[in-house]
């Protein structure tokens, strides 16, 4: 009972963070119209949450190593709450993006630390069962997020996508859905964590702990990630791909991220309390790569664009219905995640679910290439079910594989590795998808301008493709059919790209080391003394390895 209360507190925390990744998918068009955004700004409505969620994961993990999991998780929930408040009060796109950035910073800590706590508390065999529960929580958030976001946009306002995380909603807000004026989602999550999360919490002095942090490494990770994704987002849209701005952002974004170089990842260099001190053996690289491709495949093609695209295929359906379109993949994902957790808990083997998930991802998302510019419901539902069967097992299996190969002191760093890879891939997925789609649709400018007005043609091909759905539905049948066909062709390029990435992940997964998970476990401890002992142990190993090489 105690274990399930603990997991319940983590699940609710995970739910609010995961919900904000998907609730925007059906609200983005309303936000774009309300705040008058360009296509590039539209893309950053989603990326502004996902980017800091990825970049903040390593420092959140290191802070929890120093100060303990519970207080740092509580702080991340508070940060998430503040970001939600700013987003709800946004009067322009800059303020909204600022709120999403703060939200994402807190969300990155919530998701990463929830997984870390399970790794601390439970044995390798038991972890899989509870990670399955977290996977179901994420799946429920995936399913409810677009529906709730669409309902808010249709009946109240997109701002309620942010008010929902407050401990109270404004009394003056319209309430046709008969929702209560008190929605204590973030508040209840924080209270449950405070009451039921019983883990080792060291008494680390605040100043000493902060001085032990690798702030230079933290700034490097955040700065490099932002530069890289800005370069990808600007390429071909705001600036030409060969412009100095785009080239410099991408090159320096990759080059400056020294803290995550492979030599550091493999433990050949050990830094004092580094922001990403993942001294883990090389065999974990394929699981991290699988998690990366999983994140890259998940968000854009499965959760972000289909609601908007499918709504264009129908006769102006309500926005709440476009979220229902995602239920097949969300429900199947939950079932697959639960089954995977039970299988790993029973057998102790994590490689078969990874292989199965990647094969189904290739099949399911490869079938998306066959989607038509009209509502072919048999295709839409069956293809999503197959994709969900592939996505579900990959929520927990890669992190279980990594935890099985790491020391207890490196649990947070291992979780940070997986979630950094997954979150940065999710953010990159939106950027990659936007770049591929926008550049492809621009190639059809001559076709489109022959059937629609020059103004609408320019809107569709020069930055407003996603926000032009109302104008497209108002076109004559022949013109509407041509534009939808070009939309579908542009999206097909995305499906091909993501399917190829899934194949690359399957090839990498072959190199995952084979182990049978143990049922034995000892509670992990945190604090500077534990981290220092682990660091000295790594240094001693390096000295012995160097001496052996010298001989």
From Swiss-Prot:
Main location, first listed in the record: membrane
Carbohydrate-modified residues: 165, 178, 524
Record field: transmembrane: 40-60, 71-91, 102-122, 132-152, 179-199, 206-228, 233-255, 324-344, 354-374, 380-400, 417-437, 493-513
GO cellular component terms, A-Z: plasma membrane
One Pfam family per UniProt: MFS_1
Induction note: Expression is positively controlled by the cluster-specific regulator ATEG_00326.
Keyword Protease (UniProt): no
Protein topology in the membrane: Multi-pass membrane protein
Protein name: MFS-type transporter ATEG_00331
Species annotation: Aspergillus terreus (strain NIH 2624 / FGSC A1156)
